[in-house]
Amino acid sequence: MSQATAKVNREVQAFLQDLKGKTIDHVFFVACGGSSAIMYPSKYVFDRESKSINSDLYSANEFIQRNPVQLGEKSLVILCSHSGNTPETVKAAAFARGKGALTIAMTFKPESPLAQEAQYVAQYDWGDEALAINTNYGVLYQIVFGTLQVLENNTKFEQAIEGLDQLQAVYEKALKQEADNAKQFAKAHEKESIIYTMASGANYGVAYSYSICILMEMQWIHSHAIHAGEYFHGPFEIIDESVPFIILLGLDETRPLEERALTFSKKYGKKLTVLDAASYDFTAIDDSVKGYLAPLVLNRVLRSYADELAEERNHPLSHRRYMWKVEY
């Protein structure tokens, strides 16, 4: 066992061992909400790295209703639900198995319905004390890069796992670097009724998650995650000096899209919060995977912005009016 493999979640190790010798021609990422958002970088990895395996990302219920014709015995379906009892995702696991697909579920609760429905389950850690490599993002990347290594002999597994192992230190430095900025953001946006987010490539899922989970779900602030590549095809008409934007710049191949959007926004906007992964210390991370790991750092930093905003607005991130409280 290599040093990198030894750092991989044991449940993921078991899955990867059983994956050897299997034929997979399609990977489906299936989840809802924030659990779906964390899968965007992994879809990006497959697009960039896989030579023979197609991949798609679906909201769980649409996965069932659309019923992709490619779904079958040569498919791998990766699912995620933090609670493990998201009804649509549990049903999606059963649906996929019914089609003969191989399924692995990620969850914080290994005894949950989703864990029982999938053939394999990988538990991740959660909370401020969780190490980066053991979080939902970290475990998902273990599955993704491990799958690429097993099925296609992809060479980035070692670099990705070592990078995940070093990522906690990157988090800690970035959080210190952004501490004052997060407080200033909270004070400046305390009374805002709408905040847009924008990114592209591997980073888009982070913008999407912050928009739908943090701002809309947890703070009841109107929001929309704008793809930087789509900005100049409609959305840029909304910007002026009164409209707040959070703009993310990553380290992947689509960074020029984000830079172009930022340049225009600086010209016509004023309330811009810019998080640039290039300003964080990635020196311990191999160059070949920096673009893939940057979204994880941006996500962690943005969480600190969310904590400060919730504190400033006296609106706890745990507060809900519909979710888990009414029938829906």
Swiss-Prot record:
Gene3D superfamilies per record = 1.10.10.2240, 3.40.50.12570, Glucose-6-phosphate isomerase like protein, domain 1 (3.40.50.10490)
Q: Which Gene Ontology terms describe the biological processes this protein takes part in?
A: fructose 6-phosphate metabolic process; protein N-linked glycosylation; UDP-N-acetylglucosamine metabolic process
Alphabetized InterPro entries for the sequence: FrlB_SIS, Fructosamine_deglycase_FrlB, GlmS/FrlB_SIS, SIS_dom, SIS_dom_sf
Q: What is its EC number?
A: 3.5.-.-
What molecular functions are annotated in GO for this chain? carbohydrate derivative binding; glutamine-fructose-6-phosphate transaminase (isomerizing) activity; hydrolase activity
Per UniProt, the enzyme's principal EC class comes to: hydrolase
Q: Keywords in UniProt for this one? A: Carbohydrate metabolism, Hydrolase, Repeat
**SIS domain boundaries:** 15-153, 181-311
List the PANTHER family.
FRUCTOSELYSINE 6-PHOSPHATE DEGLYCASE, GLUCOSAMINE--FRUCTOSE-6-PHOSPHATE AMINOTRANSFERASE, ISOMERIZING
The UniProt function text for this chain reads: Catalyzes the conversion of a range of fructosamine 6-phosphates to glucose 6-phosphate and a free amino acid.
Describe the protein's quaternary organization and the partners it interacts with: Homooctamer.
Q: What is this protein called?
A: Fructosamine deglycase FrlB
Which species does the entry assign this protein to?
Bacillus subtilis (strain 168)
